[in-house]
């Protein structure tokens, strides 16, 4: 947390220098005030608080936890002022650990946004609906630590923004090897990553190959279950294709084809590619589910919108313009063919041809029908283009508050991941993060601070014998971790409290 507060103080100082005439409360916050208010935002999801207004109606132990209670008006103002100083940019480096690793996993997460305003739309995967929303691109390292986040409108496909996004990740972390799902499976992106000197590990679609025969492959490994792993390139060389392939042929089931650029071959053994790719599920997809459950990842923050050109209409207009241009060429071609054939019919008529005249008239009839068809199609496209009218406007979300709160969520997830890794080293009984959060944050308790220690009492009323035993083991583990609060040793005790 000290790193976060230091980053915020630097952002405040920088803003004050750049805008010496501006004056609002955040610019004058003491370190303690800044620390407590950010802590309130940080711990809110663990207390079951997703939207800030829930601070006004939900009973929560914030006063016990950080020594100060807050309502939504105060925290809403605080968040608005963090937005004003562009705190998201300042907080982003706090996500990156000292040793970020050598592999970055990137995935997008769609969040629905309900509004009556005309906004750009995309497919919100978890709801299966086309609607307004936002797309968070989140990067994790190989141990599941979140590294970077950036928001985009939902109508922009991942492939359109991924190169610029990865450039920012490289600048922030120094990692140049990326593992991304089939949303970026294309030769163009493989070439783009290869030109940058980056590694990209992805999968080939099933319709892009005809099985093992499509590849000049060499057997590199055979698993105990009969699965064979091959490595190679296309059977028919494609000199413009920089991809190398790893093919997994299970004893039963379909072929799986992974591909990577030269950087991937330099950094990873080809036999390890399938396992590295499969770890996406736990590192990212399951992480998103956890952050939805206890990190408020799906909660929208901020109502500001930015008006701009209607990209849906713009794309439709561009498609119609291309189709209309092609239709005009077809009309001109058919018109020329009809004119040429009419001249032949006139020639046959003047020369008194019999059978040839019938043939040419029959051909002319077919050409005239084809001309009418292409002219009709052209008229339809022209009418559709005219119906679109002048280019309109649609709104996009202002993502500044959303980004700040998502960085908060990622910081929380990183802290919980590190905390669990340490705690499990002191426990003989395995426990999941969800179970631990339920035991500690969904039960009442008390906090006692003396001159020499801080004691947290957890209410055990209503716990079954097995869960009481588990909570006791967790309490012992927490005490063994030698945690400290403001320099004082922290102890966790269990106590049955009256209802």
Which residues fall in each region the model found?
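Dynamic "connector" segments at or just before major functional cores
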Residues: 1-130, 136-153, 159-164, 171, ...
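Short, solvent-exposed helix-loop connector elements
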Residues: 22-29, 263, 269-278, 299-308, ...
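A short acidic (Asp/Glu
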Residues: 115-117, 186-193, 211-215
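An anionic, glycine-rich sequence signature occurring as long contiguous blocks
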Residues: 151, 195-287, 292, 452-453, ...
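Short, surface-exposed connector motifs at secondary-structure boundaries
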Residues: 169-177
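Acidic, metal-coordinating catalytic cores used for nucleic-acid/nucleotide bond scission
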Residues: 179-188, 206-209
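Charged, amphipathic alpha-helical linkers/stalks
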Residues: 288-349
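Extended alpha-helical coiled-coil "stalk/arm" regions
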Residues: 334-385
């Amino acid at each position: 947390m000290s790193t976060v507060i230091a980053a915020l103080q630097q952002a405040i100082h920088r803003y004050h220098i750049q805008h010496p005439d501006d004056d609002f409360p955040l610019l004058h916050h003491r370190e303690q005030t800044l620390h407590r208010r950010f802590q309130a935002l940080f711990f809110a999801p663990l207390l079951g608080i997703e939207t800030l207004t829930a601070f006004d109606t939900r009973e929560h132990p914030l006063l016990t936890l950080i020594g100060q209670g807050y309502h939504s008006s105060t925290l809403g103002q605080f968040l608005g002022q963090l937005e004003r100083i562009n705190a998201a940019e300042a907080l982003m480096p706090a996500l990156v650990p000292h040793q970020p690793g050598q592999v970055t996993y990137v995935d997008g997460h769609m969040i629905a946004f309900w509004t009556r305003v005309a906004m750009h739309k995309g497919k919100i995967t978890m709801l299966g609906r086309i609607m307004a929303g936002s797309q968070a691109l989140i990067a994790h390292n190989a141990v599941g630590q979140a590294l970077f986040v950036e928001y985009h409108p939902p109508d922009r496909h991942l492939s359109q923004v991924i190169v610029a996004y990865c450039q920012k990740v490289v600048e922030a972390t120094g990692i140049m090897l990326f593992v991304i799902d089939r949303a970026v499976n294309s030769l163009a992106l493989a070439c783009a990553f290869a030109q940058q000197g980056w590694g990209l590990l992805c999968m080939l679609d099933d319709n892009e190959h005809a099985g093992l025969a499509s590849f000049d492959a060499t057997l590199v490994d055979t698993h105990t279950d009969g699965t064979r792993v091959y490595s190679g390139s296309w059977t028919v060389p494609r000199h413009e294709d920089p991809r190398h392939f790893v093919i997994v042929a299970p004893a039963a089931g379909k072929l799986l084809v992974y591909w990577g650029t030269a950087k991937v071959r330099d950094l990873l053994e080809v036999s390890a590619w399938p396992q590295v790719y499969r770890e996406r599920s736990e590192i990212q997809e399951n992480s998103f589910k956890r952050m939805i459950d206890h990190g408020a990842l799906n909660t929208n923050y901020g109502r500001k919108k930015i008006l701009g050109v209607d990209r849906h209409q713009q794309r439709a207009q561009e498609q119609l313009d291309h189709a209309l241009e092609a239709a005009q060429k077809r009309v001109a071609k058919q018109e020329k063919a009809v004119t040429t054939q009419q001249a032949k019919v006139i020639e046959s008529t003047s020369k008194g041809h019999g059978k040839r005249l019938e043939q040419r008239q029959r051909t002319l009839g077919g050409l005239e029908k084809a001309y009418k068809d292409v002219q009709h199609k052209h008229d339809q496209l022209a009418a559709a283009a005219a119906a679109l009218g002048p280019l309109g406007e649609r709104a996009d979300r202002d993502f500044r508050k959303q980004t700040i709160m998502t960085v908060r969520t990622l910081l929380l997830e990183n802290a919980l991941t590190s905390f669990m890794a340490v705690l499990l080293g002191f426990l003989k009984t395995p426990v999941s993060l969800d179970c631990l959060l339920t035991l500690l944050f969904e039960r009442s308790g008390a906090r006692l601070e003396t001159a020499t220690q801080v004691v947290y009492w957890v209410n055990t009323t209503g716990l079954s014998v097995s869960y009481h035993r588990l909570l006791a083991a967790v309490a012992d583990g927490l005490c063994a971790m030698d945690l400290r609060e403001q320099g004082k040793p922290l102890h966790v005790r269990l106590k049955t409290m009256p209802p």
